[in-house]
Amino acid sequence: MKFDPEQVKLETKEDFDRAWSTSGKYVAQPDSTKDYTIHNEPGKAHPVYDTLNKLREAYINLGFEEMVNPIIIEESDIFRQFNYEALAVLDRVYYIGGLPRPNVGISDERFAQIEQIFGRSLTDSDKETIREILHKYKKGEIEGDDLVADLSAGLQIQDSKVAVMIDHVFPEFKKLEPVCSRKTLRSHMTSGWFITLGAMVDRRTTPLKLFSVDLVFRREQEENADRLRAYHSASCVIMDPDVTVEHGKAVAAGLLRQFGFSQFKFKPDDKRSKYYTPDTQIEVYGYHPALKGSNTKYKDGWVEIATFGIYSATALSQYDIPYPVMNLGLGVERLAMILHQAKDMRDMVYPQFKEEWDLTDAEIARMISMEKHPQTKEGHDIAMAIIATVERNGSAPSPCRFDVWEGTINGKKIKVYLEEKEEGKKLCGGAIMNEAYVYKGDLLGIPLNNPKFAEVAEKGAPTGIRNIDAIANAAARNIEEGVYETTVKMSRAPGDVYVKVDPVALRYIQGKKHKIDFRGPVFTSIKAELIE
């Protein structure tokens, strides 16, 4: 259930143990009348992972075998691969650090603090348990993830109190500063390929065709529309005594044709990375018809999309690899931007952090629902009977009454009917059959038979909810709860006709200054009466 974060923050600050221990009150209890089965329905793939999976399939279609390359690379490997370029490469890598294990001393004063937190005295056995477990932690025999649990089990005390003890009694833990190691996060997929090929060269025959699609990390000064600190590289290698740059061209064309690219240009890369053989480092440009005339910087249809080259013997020999190796790589996010015509990589990869967020009409429509639903079969039957009666007789002249349903619900025998007593009107108002649509960000209740709203009906996103649907279900639920009259007159907002707008959709619509318009004469009265 929904809770107030500010109130919980205050409670947590005052007494973490109590706030945490009682946080279960915010979790709804299972309702035996509800069906919690998760049914198959269309989901939505992220552009990056959609592209990533298609790249995996594309490589497999070309006969490549998928591998997982090491993601943690020793600094020494960078020097082996890049030689005197290594320092420039290392300037852009992330070194891995960790917190040292503190040498914790425990005085009588600290034991007194612990007793105050635990609310009980510590036995000699308890004190020895604390000393022993902290000593094992220092020696690395207990992992940080297990420290609280082991202390909790050893002392027979709630783990939340142990967490408070560590925070309050042992400031050494909070004063720790990370110590850097000589291990790095992979900045080039190439770093992993040398290690992988070095391990496989004596076990596999050539030609050996491998690929990997995975994360790489660069210590960029800042992220921008074209560059992120963490991104996915789709990389492949062919190890073969007779491999040439023509293999690189063939792989590039075979791979990218599967994504709609139809023409290719190959240009020497000015970077001349030292892990490639001189004059083999090639940039790949592809022409994609969908980009021609697009509102992007690729409007001429051409885009730089990949790079390939032949690994140098100077680098390969460091791993005892005696064969030339062609390597091709491309950025998954870059390809995803092209295929989805995105203008900013940050917004495409992390849409949840966009200052200017966007919802499609269909996404908003999925956030519109009926406010109430009957919980019994009889209630459901009542709702369906109300809807059927209005569909048949909604325009009947008044005064009029139409019996809808008769039966027993919750042990009471009742009769349900629709009624309009006033003369010169109809059983229901003209807006009773209006349906909720989302069009260009507006949420509208429209009559589908009115030509004025033909464009909305044709191009908008339907919610599938008519006024009568929501009202009938609400009336049925009211009857289940013993409320025997549901009357709606003029509608001005969704809530007037028991239509619910998710708070996210409401914030979006209001924030974008779109409108919600459910105005219309509904004028319907649904009643129930007890019968003998």
Swiss-Prot record:
It comes from the Archaea. The keyword rRNA processing does not apply. GO terms for biological process: translation; tRNA aminoacylation. Substrate binds at H188, M189, T190, S233, A234, S235, Y275, Y276, N327. Signal peptide: none annotated. Its EC number is 6.1.1.27. One of its GO terms (molecular function) is ATP binding. Keywords: Aminoacyl-tRNA synthetase, ATP-binding, Ligase, Nucleotide-binding, Protein biosynthesis. It is an enzyme of class 6 (ligase). It catalyses: tRNA(Cys) + O-phospho-L-serine + ATP = O-phospho-L-seryl-tRNA(Cys) + AMP + diphosphate. InterPro entries: aa-tRNA-synth_II (IPR006195), aa-tRNA-synth_II/BPL/LPL (IPR045864), O-Pseryl-tRNA(Cys)_ligase (IPR005246), Phenylalanyl-tRNA_Synthase (IPR002319), SepRS_C (IPR041590). NCBIfam families: sepS. Homotetramer. Interacts with SepCysS. Belongs to the class-II aminoacyl-tRNA synthetase family. O-phosphoseryl-tRNA(Cys) synthetase subfamily. Catalyzes the attachment of O-phosphoserine (Sep) to tRNA(Cys). This is O-phosphoserine--tRNA(Cys) ligase.
